[in-house]
């Protein structure tokens, strides 16, 4: 029986659920290959950065369910979830992931729009005369 590690990662409004098991390096995101889902090379490398830092690219089969937000938030959520799964698999990997802040939940969220303003901080045009 295979051991499956289940973790969750969040970023902005995106939530990623990762199911990681020992395997050959097959990565599936929402039933699509990772290359098809994250077409942008930067977003794909950002999502898979914990595997690269831990040098475990071909050691695990990973199934990812991600929803909410856009691709940037989703790649950040996937990255955090994979990092947490790697630490759950082997606690010694934590030291390698720490310097790149891969285990830290990014707290930045979209600032809400305020009344009397055009956006969160932008004011309407002001005319003195």
Swiss-Prot record:
InterPro entries in the record, alphabetically? Answer: Ribosomal_Su5_D2-typ_SF, Ribosomal_uS9, Ribosomal_uS9_bac/plastid, Ribosomal_uS9_CS, Ribsml_uS5_D2-typ_fold_subgr
Originating species:
Chlorobaculum tepidum (strain ATCC 49652 / DSM 12025 / NBRC 103806 / TLS) (Chlorobium tepidum)
The protein's name in its UniProt record: Small ribosomal subunit protein uS9
Region Disordered: start and end of each range? 108-129
Where are the membrane-spanning stretches? none
Report the family membership.
Belongs to the universal ribosomal protein uS9 family.
Q: Mind listing the UniProt keywords for this protein, alphabetically?
A: Ribonucleoprotein, Ribosomal protein
Provide the GO MF annotations for this entry.
RNA binding; structural constituent of ribosome
Mind telling me which HAMAP family this protein's record contains? Ribosomal_uS9_B
Task: Please verify whether the record's keywords include Ribonucleoprotein.
Answer: yes
Pfam families on file: Ribosomal_S9
């Amino acid at each position: 029986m295979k051991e499956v590690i289940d973790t969750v990662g969040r970023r902005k409004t995106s939530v990623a659920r990762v199911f990681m098991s020992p395997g050959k390096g097959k990565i599936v995101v929402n039933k699509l290959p990772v290359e098809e889902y994250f077409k942008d090379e930067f977003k794909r490398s950002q999502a898979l950065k914990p595997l690269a830092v831990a040098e475990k690219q071909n050691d695990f089969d990973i199934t990812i369910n991600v929803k909410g937000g856009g691709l940037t938030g989703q790649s950040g959520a996937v990255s955090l979830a994979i990092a947490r799964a790697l630490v759950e698999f082997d606690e010694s990997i934590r030291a390698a992931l720490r310097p790149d802040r891969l285990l830290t939940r990014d707290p930045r969220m979209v600032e809400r729009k305020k009344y009397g303003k055009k956006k969160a901080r932008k004011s309407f045009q002001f005319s003195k005369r």
